[in-house]
């Protein structure tokens, strides 16, 4: 091919078409990058939330600081999945480090902050599409029953065969009241705790992961790991408790996706929490 010798002609012949192609590539990269950044931030926040309960205090503070940095970046870049998720996590971790130890209270305030953000901030409105009842047909009901029975049996087996030492748990959470009142309180706790944990992990976490990564297994696994990690000091606790809670989180995530809403996983979760309340009130209390 014969190239033009005059510089101006050469510019028009070669450089200008090339610059237009570069401009197109840059535009395409900018169009794609916000979603990619959103996914990276969501995964980063989730991984730090998984690590924070499992490591020493100094490392947990570092993980929390990392979440704050990612939250600032998510808000600066207006990431629709990472921004509300990071706010929820920052609120929960702030309460935890400030001395609040009761998990449902932490989750409740975190969810209130999340709800306020997605309602007030204009570019986040109508992003919390997970907050719906969903289906509860025969197949979903069967899944709930199977998941509830399996998880309840797993928790009971954990208590009966591993003989965990949980007097501190009973002393901290079970007041000195008549058994009848404790049973009523246990049922109320089971419903509230199930609703809060499902809203947090199958709602806030799974929704952010699904919308940024896509509704595949990685999103399902990450939310289950985050759910399992917070049970390191819960009931069931320790690493066996983390494993059981992680498997349970996978079950609940599948049910939430199949049902397309929150009612079904909440019902299945209540079954398991009723078993936990029964163990604490009827088997683990020193008075019994």
How would you label these PLM feature ranges?
Residues 193-202:
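Acidic (Asp/Glu-rich) catalytic motifs at the cytosolic membrane interface
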Residues 52-123:
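Alpha-helical transmembrane segments in multi-pass membrane proteins
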Residues 101-109, 181, 185, 211-223, ...:
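Membrane-interface starts of transmembrane alpha-helices
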Residues 22-64, 208, 212:
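Alpha-helical transmembrane segments and their cytosolic membrane-interface
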Residues 106, 115, 120-193, 211, ...:
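Juxtamembrane helix-loop-helix connectors linking adjacent transmembrane helices
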Residues 195, 217-230, 234-288:
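Functionally important transmembrane alpha-helices
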Residues 34-51, 83-92, 146-152, 220-223:
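Alpha-helical transmembrane segments
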């Amino acid at each position: 091919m014969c190239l033009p010798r005059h510089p101006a002609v050469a510019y028009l012949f070669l450089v200008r078409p090339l610059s237009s192609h570069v401009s197109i590539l840059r535009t395409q990269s900018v169009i794609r990058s916000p979603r990619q950044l959103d996914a990276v931030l969501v995964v980063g926040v989730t991984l730090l939330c998984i690590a924070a309960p499992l490591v020493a205090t100094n490392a947990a503070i570092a993980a929390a600081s990392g979440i704050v940095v990612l939250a600032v970046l998510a808000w600066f870049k207006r990431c629709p999945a990472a921004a509300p998720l990071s706010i929820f996590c920052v609120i929960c971790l702030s309460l935890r480090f400030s001395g609040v130890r009761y998990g449902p209270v932490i989750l409740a305030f975190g969810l209130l902050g999340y709800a306020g953000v997605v309602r007030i901030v204009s570019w986040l409105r109508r992003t919390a599409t997970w907050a719906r009842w969903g289906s509860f047909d025969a197949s979903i009901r069967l899944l709930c029953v199977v998941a509830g029975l399996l998880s309840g049996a797993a928790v009971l087996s954990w208590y009966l065969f591993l003989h965990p030492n949980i007097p501190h748990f009973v002393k901290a959470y079970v007041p000195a009241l008549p058994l009848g009142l404790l049973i009523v309180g246990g049922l109320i706790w089971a419903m509230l705790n199930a609703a809060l944990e499902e809203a947090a992990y199958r709602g806030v976490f799974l929704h952010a992961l699904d919308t940024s990564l896509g509704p595949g297994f990685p999103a399902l696994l990450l939310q289950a790991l985050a759910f399992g990690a917070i049970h390191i000091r819960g009931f069931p606790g320790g690493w066996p408790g983390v494993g059981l809670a992680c498997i349970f989180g996978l079950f609940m995530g599948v049910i939430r996706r199949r049902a397309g809403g929150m009612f079904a996983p909440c019902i299945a979760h209540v079954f398991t929490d009723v078993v936990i309340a029964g163990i604490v009130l009827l088997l683990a209390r020193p008075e019994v």
